[in-house]
């Protein structure tokens, strides 16, 4: 029994080794066929070259995939052994071989090309989709940032408006208080200026009236324009009058040496009384003179007058003429108008 079991196990292992060798030979044949197809094909596409490179660089992967079809032996032998080539509970002889169906290489190449194209398209679409999504996210972020900035700006504007309103109200209150004080002070100043202006107008009116009165009194002032010129003329006229008064007082002192009047000490009333007395005395003297008869032609008849009386009359008349001439000369020398 043991010999039979050992023989069966050795046969199975030998058959397994033969199948692996046949598998390797088949893989080499497939690679040679692929190379021949690619060399004889007129359309050498880059996809086929990529496939060949993939198959040439990954021979180990193909081998592994080929060996993956074979199941590993378990701990038990006999009924549990199965190679995948037939039903279990059967033994394989050395002469048995694995009959492989022929595979269309063109179909395999087309399938692999389609798969690579699909993978490439997926890889291309992924970044496009990513870029679109990124653009959408960026747009959303921008919109959110803009809305936040606008909200912040609105809030800032509201705060600034509120602060400006409060500042305006405070400034208005302060300005109103200042305006009230200013108006009060300005009103007082205006009242003072108005009073001053009214007083000044009244004073100027009085001065103008007095100047007009002086113009009427003083001869020659109507020809002068300007208050300064008028005042100069008035001063000259007053000085001339003063000189005339002094001259008259001197003449009176000569005529009446007993009185010895001092012009500076004599008051105006006394001066007026003295002149009235002098005029009365002159009139009494003229009353004593007889009336002169008139001729038919209206001339005086001096034959009725005594020669003594005529001499007495002629003497004072001559003295009065000399006095009048002297007064005229002094007036002409002292004042010119």
UniProtKB/Swiss-Prot annotation:
It is found in: Nucleus. Highly expressed in hypocotyls and cotyledons. Expressed in leaves, stems, and flowers. Its main location: nucleus. The keyword Isomerase does not apply. Residues 191-241 form the bHLH domain. CDD domains: bHLH_AtBPE_like. GO terms for biological process: brassinosteroid mediated signaling pathway; gibberellic acid mediated signaling pathway; regulation of DNA-templated transcription. Keywords: Brassinosteroid signaling pathway, DNA-binding, Gibberellin signaling pathway, Growth regulation, Nucleus, Transcription, Transcription regulation. One of its GO terms (cellular component) is nucleus. PROSITE patterns: BHLH. Gene3D superfamilies: Helix-loop-helix DNA-binding domain. GO terms for molecular function: DNA binding; protein dimerization activity. The keyword DNA-binding applies. Residues 119-180 are annotated as: Disordered. Residues 152-165 have a biased composition (Polar residues). It comes from the Eukaryota. Residues 126-151 have a biased composition (Basic and acidic residues). Homodimer. Interacts with IBH1. Plants over-expressing HBI1 show increased petiole length and early flowering, and plants suppressing HBI1 display dwarf, short-petiole and late-flowering phenotype. Although HBI1 contains a degenerate basic motif it can bind DNA in vitro. Atypical bHLH transcription factor that acts as a positive regulator of cell elongation downstream of multiple external and endogenous signals by direct binding to the promoters and activation of the two expansin genes EXPA1 and EXPA8, encoding cell wall loosening enzymes. Transcriptional activity is inhibited when binding to the bHLH transcription factor IBH1. This is Transcription factor HBI1. The gene is HBI1.
């Amino acid at each position: 029994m043991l010999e039979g079991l050992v023989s069966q196990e050795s046969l199975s292992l030998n058959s397994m080794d033969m199948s692996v060798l046949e598998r390797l030979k088949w893989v080499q044949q497939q690679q040679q066929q692929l190379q021949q197809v690619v060399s004889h094909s007129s359309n050498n596409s880059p996809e086929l070259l990529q496939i060949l490179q993939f198959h040439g660089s990954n021979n180990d992967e193909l081998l592994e995939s080929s060996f993956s079809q074979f199941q590993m032996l378990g701990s038990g032998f006999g009924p549990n052994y199965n190679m995948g080539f037939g039903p279990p509970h059967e033994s394989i002889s050395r002469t048995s071989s694995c009959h492989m169906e022929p595979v269309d290489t063109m179909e395999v190449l087309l399938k692999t090309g389609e798969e690579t194209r699909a993978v490439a398209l997926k890889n291309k679409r992924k970044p496009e989709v990513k870029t679109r999504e990124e653009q959408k996210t960026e747009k959303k972020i921008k919109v959110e940032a803009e809305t936040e900035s606008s909200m912040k700006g609105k809030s800032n504007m509201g705060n600034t408006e509120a602060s400006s309103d409060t500042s305006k109200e405070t400034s208005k209150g302060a300005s109103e208080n200042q305006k009230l004080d200013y108006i009060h002070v300005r009103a007082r100043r205006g009242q003072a200026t108005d009073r001053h202006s009214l007083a000044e107008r009244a004073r100027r009116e009085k001065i103008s009236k007095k100047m007009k009165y002086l113009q009427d009194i003083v001869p020659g002032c109507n020809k002068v324009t300007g208050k300064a010129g008028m005042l100069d003329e008035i001063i000259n006229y007053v000085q001339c009058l003063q000189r005339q008064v002094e001259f008259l007082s001197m003449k009176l002192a000569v005529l009446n040496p007993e009185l010895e009047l001092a012009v500076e000490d004599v008051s105006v009333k006394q001066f007026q009384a003295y002149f009235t007395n002098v005029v009365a005395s002159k009139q009494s003297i003229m009353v004593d003179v007889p009336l002169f008869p008139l001729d038919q032609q209206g001339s005086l008849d001096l034959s009725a007058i005594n020669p003594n009386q005529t001499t007495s009359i002629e003497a004072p008349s001559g003295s009065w003429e000399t006095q009048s001439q002297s007064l005229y000369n002094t007036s002409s020398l002292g004042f010119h108008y």
